Design a protein with these regions (language model features):
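Short regulatory helix/loop adjacent to the ATP-binding pocket of P-loop NTPases
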Residues: 103-110, 194-205
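N-terminal pre-Walker A segment at the start of P-loop NTPase domains
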Residues: 13-38
Length: 211
């Protein structure tokens, strides 16, 4: 539709302005781009993670706990050892939970309510890629949580077709170039049998899948 065409044009313009260009392998290897860890051994950046499971199995609670440690800089236990956490902003893009439900889940993990490092955008749509890039430039989050893949897609695509994964390919391709490097966790619901839901292109588009 017209909105999708406009979004695609804006995306192409952003990539053009960022200077996508031909380079030699030598020039590529000399780039200062590196992968850092926000939480050592768990959350690298730039990185895109798909977290999937059945409803009510704690996917959201897991991500809120990770978010709490990043927003506050509190050490995180990794393999029985407390590891330092790089403190920074957290951006939650919510298309799945009601505001009341999200508040209750935050309370369950003792999320610090006076923390000004965490930003929530309700009724998010993955089709708003240009707005996403603006938010990334403005907030520069260490962690982005998208809850959930289907909830933020708004029925725009058939989840069994490869087009459904296009926004995830954009995240992986542009992370650290079109917008500041970050860790993106995308929550995805399993099918009624507990298996993976939707096209296999979803898993192919991300850096890692957690189940």
């Amino acid at each position: 539709d017209g909105k999708s065409q406009i979004e695609n044009l804006l995306k192409k313009q952003r990539r053009y302005e960022k200077g996508s260009e031909l380079m030699t392998v030598k020039e590529l290897m000399e780039l200062e781009d590196t992968r850092e860890f926000t939480i050592p051994g768990i959350l690298p950046a730039p990185f895109v993670i798909l977290l999937y499971g059945s409803g009510g199995d704690g996917k959201s609670m897991t991500t809120w706990t990770l978010a709490k440690h990043i927003a506050t800089g509190a050490p995180f236990l990794v393999k029985d050892k407390l590891m330092p956490v790089e403190k920074g902003p957290v951006l939650i893009l919510n298309g799945d939970q009601s505001r009341i439900q999200l508040k209750e889940q935050m309370e369950d993990v003792d999320y610090p309510i006076d923390n000004d490092n965490t930003f929530v955008h309700h009724d998010w749509s993955l089709q708003n890629y240009d707005k996403f890039c603006d938010l990334m430039d403005e907030i520069q989050p260490k962690l982005v949580i998208i809850d959930s893949l289907v909830g933020c897609s708004g029925g725009a695509f058939d989840e069994n077709k490869s087009d459904f994964a296009n926004p995830l390919y954009d995240f992986a391709q542009d992370n650290g170039t079109l917008f500041p490097a970050t860790t993106i966790i995308i929550i995805h619901h399993a099918n009624k049998n507990g298996g993976f839901r939707g096209t296999t292109a979803i898993r192919d588009a991300v850096d890692e899948t957690w189940a």
